[in-house]
Amino acid sequence: MKRFTQALIAVIALCTAQLALSQEAIEITSGTDKATPIAVVPFGWQGSAPLSEDLAEISANDLRNTGMFAPMERSNMLSYPVRGEEINSRDWKMIGVDYVVVGQVTNQPGTDRYELNYSLYSILREQVLLSKTVSGTQSQLRDM
């Protein structure tokens, strides 16, 4: 029985080693030649002192750097909604935007804590696709 167990372990080890040594090739056959138009609207702010980081601009730059999105310049935006219900889909369709990100940053009074509520809105579907709340300290703003 001991030899059988050893032989079984050896066979399993060989099979596992063979699988580990096999390499898979990933072939990319197509991509996108046009980035998706998106607007990251300046986030609303509720706090006593100016916010040290422009979280909307950071988000827009991160999206641009993926190569998959083309964030709209703020100067071309017709409005600056803070919540999804303030979005006028007709305006965004007119300027060729498919998605809009809106948000609100709040400083919790008397603390170093901040809360960011943001939503991703589909202009074509006229609905919120994602809504999330994250929080952190002032030193964590860029990571929020």
Question: Which positions does each model-derived feature cover?
Answer:
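Absolute protein N-terminus
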Residues: 1, 22-24
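N-terminal signal peptide c-region/cleavage motif recognized by signal peptidases
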Residues: 15-17
